[in-house]
Regions:
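Conserved NTPase motor "head" modules and their coupling/switch loops across ABC/AAA+ ATPases, GTPases
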Residues: 1-31, 45, 171-295
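ABC transporter nucleotide-binding domains
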Residues: 24, 42, 111-113, 135, ...
Length: 295
């Protein structure tokens, strides 16, 4: 896979950019705050339609304008692809591949696979489950289109459920829809748990040897996926996981109503790592994090 060129309009700090890349190795350099990371973020966005540091697409649009544009010319699968993303403040984004509008971001899967490493990746060790879930989502979305579809649907359902829990005391009729949203969230959530658990298992097969080499043979790394307590085997099929997620939802139903917060589901899952029997601590130099239990 080769990124041949990149064009940006009103993306982050770029009013307009046209860049052509060498098919081998490219070194991006410049002053602080000049836009190096923004450029790499744009390339990665064409891979998954997700940003490693922005929760909402509007965060990537330059202040004072209504939309941004990202376009990349890519060589992949022995074919040329033109990938485009149009971001809008007041409307849904639009994704295009070779002039054809894509229905979902999952259709980008496999066209441009990227690996992005940045200082924020240390949050995988130093911070909580949210950073780890973002890492999983970014990686799996490139490999499994069905995962991206399930994740988008789950996030949509989650936003609806949050509004129900927030407003039900002022509008009791909202409670009649809660069970339906719980069922649909459990159905998509079962797929998410299944895919995440299998990804961590594959990571566990290769990451320890790499970590051992980096540490000069002094440390051993192990990874373990954790989900809600009622799921006995996250590697099981989605049909097996579904009733276990429903059980967890039911057990937390009253607590959710009382707190007006969503307390159950894959949104609460994470994964843990151990290095030579210890876990990361919250504060340490960037070169080597210290250790404490991760959530």
């Amino acid at each position: 896979m080769i990124v041949k060129s990149l064009e940006l309009d009103f993306f982050r700090n770029y009013v307009h950019l046209e860049a052509v890349f060498d098919p081998r190795v490219n070194l991006i350099y410049g002053d602080n705050a000049q836009g190096k990371t923004n450029l790499l973020e744009a390339v990665a966005y064409l891979s998954t339609a997700r940003s490693h540091r922005a929760r909402y697409d509007r965060e990537m649009i330059m202040l004072g304008v209504d939309g941004a544009f990202v376009k990349g010319e890519v060589r992949s699968r022995d074919r040329d692809f033109t990938l485009e993303a149009r971001l809008n403040r007041g409307a849904r984004r639009q994704l295009w591949s070779n002039g054809v509008r894509l229905k979902t971001a999952g259709e980008l899967s496999g066209i441009l696979n990227t690996v992005l490493f940045c200082p924020e990746d240390l949050y995988l060790i130093r911070e909580g489950g949210a950073a780890r879930r973002r890492f999983l989502d970014s990686a799996i979305c490139q490999l499994r289109p069905r995962y991206e579809q399930a994740l988008s649907e789950y996030n949509r359902l989650y936003d609806h459920k949050v509004r129900i829990l927030r407003d039900w005391q002022e509008n009791l009729s909202l409670l009649s829809t809660l069970d339906d949203f719980n069922l649909r969230m459990a159905q998509t959530g079962a797929l998410i748990v299944h895919y995440r658990a299998h990804f961590i298992r594959r990571l566990q097969e290769s990451a320890p040897a790499i970590h051992r080499d980096f540490s000069g043979g002094k440390e051993e790394l192990s990874l373990r996926y954790e989900t809600v307590s009622t799921v006995t085997d996250p590697l099981a099929g989605a049909k097996t996981i579904l009733p276990q997620l429903l059980e967890h939802q039911q057990a937390h139903r009253q607590a959710e109503l009382d707190s007006r917060q969503c307390l159950s589901g894959p949104i609460r899952t994470t994964w843990q790592w151990r290095s030579t029997g210890t876990r990361p601590r919250p504060t340490a130099p960037r070169g080597r994090p210290a250790r404490r239990p991760s959530p």
